[in-house]
């Protein structure tokens, strides 16, 4: 059964509304004023209230104060830079590491041209794009986890 109720076009009341121009050439409620004036402010204020409530009820600790005279053993970047950091750390030639990082967006740009004969949107019917996505996700996660290990165990994650 469908979630959406299809309109009964034989209903004289609906036909009269559509003849007057209500519906804006589509079925359903207009965005103004129903959504934009009433629902959006409720959602925005609710989101602000949830964030404010969480900030008051469970404040995040700032952590221990920074000590400029003691440097940690290994300085790690933010978590979203872990794969890039791992590439630069493992590849001995830094120019090659930068070229590899530039190859990632170049490869992503090339995917539609490689698979230009396939017009499907379903990922199961687009094997090249799906394979590139799965391989890239696996490599990014592997490199990201490896960045947290010492350099001698970073590529194997200590498994081998």
UniProtKB/Swiss-Prot annotation:
<dbReference type="GO" id="GO:0009767">
    <property type="term" value="P:photosynthetic electron transport chain"/>
</dbReference>
<dbReference type="GO" id="GO:0045158">
    <property type="term" value="F:electron transporter, transferring electrons within cytochrome b6/f complex of photosystem II activity"/>
</dbReference>
<comment type="function">
    <text>Component of the cytochrome b6-f complex, which mediates electron transfer between photosystem II (PSII) and photosystem I (PSI), cyclic electron flow around PSI, and state transitions.</text>
</comment>
<dbReference type="GO" id="GO:0045156">
    <property type="term" value="F:electron transporter, transferring electrons within the cyclic electron transport pathway of photosynthesis activity"/>
</dbReference>
<keyword id="KW-0249">Electron transport</keyword>
<keyword id="KW-0934">Plastid</keyword>
<feature type="transmembrane region" description="Helical">
    <location>
        <begin position="36"/>
        <end position="56"/>
    </location>
</feature>
<protein>
    <recommendedName>
        <fullName>Cytochrome b6-f complex subunit 4</fullName>
    </recommendedName>
</protein>
<feature type="transmembrane region" description="Helical">
    <location>
        <begin position="95"/>
        <end position="115"/>
    </location>
</feature>
<dbReference type="InterPro" id="IPR048260">
    <property type="entry name" value="Cytochrome_b_C_euk/bac"/>
</dbReference>
<feature type="transmembrane region" description="Helical">
    <location>
        <begin position="131"/>
        <end position="151"/>
    </location>
</feature>
<keyword id="KW-1133">Transmembrane helix</keyword>
<keyword id="KW-0194">Cyanelle</keyword>
<dbReference type="InterPro" id="IPR036150">
    <property type="entry name" value="Cyt_b/b6_C_sf"/>
</dbReference>
<keyword id="KW-0472">Membrane</keyword>
<dbReference type="GO" id="GO:0016491">
    <property type="term" value="F:oxidoreductase activity"/>
</dbReference>
<keyword id="KW-0812">Transmembrane</keyword>
<keyword id="KW-0793">Thylakoid</keyword>
<keyword id="KW-0602">Photosynthesis</keyword>
<comment type="subunit">
    <text>The 4 large subunits of the cytochrome b6-f complex are cytochrome b6, subunit IV (17 kDa polypeptide, petD), cytochrome f and the Rieske protein, while the 4 small subunits are petG, petL, petM and petN. The complex functions as a dimer.</text>
</comment>
<keyword id="KW-0813">Transport</keyword>
<dbReference type="InterPro" id="IPR005870">
    <property type="entry name" value="Cyt_b6/f_cplx_suIV"/>
</dbReference>
<dbReference type="Pfam" id="PF00032">
    <property type="entry name" value="Cytochrom_B_C"/>
</dbReference>
<dbReference type="InterPro" id="IPR005798">
    <property type="entry name" value="Cyt_b/b6_C"/>
</dbReference>
<dbReference type="GO" id="GO:0033115">
    <property type="term" value="C:cyanelle thylakoid membrane"/>
</dbReference>
<comment type="similarity">
    <text>Belongs to the cytochrome b family. PetD subfamily.</text>
</comment>
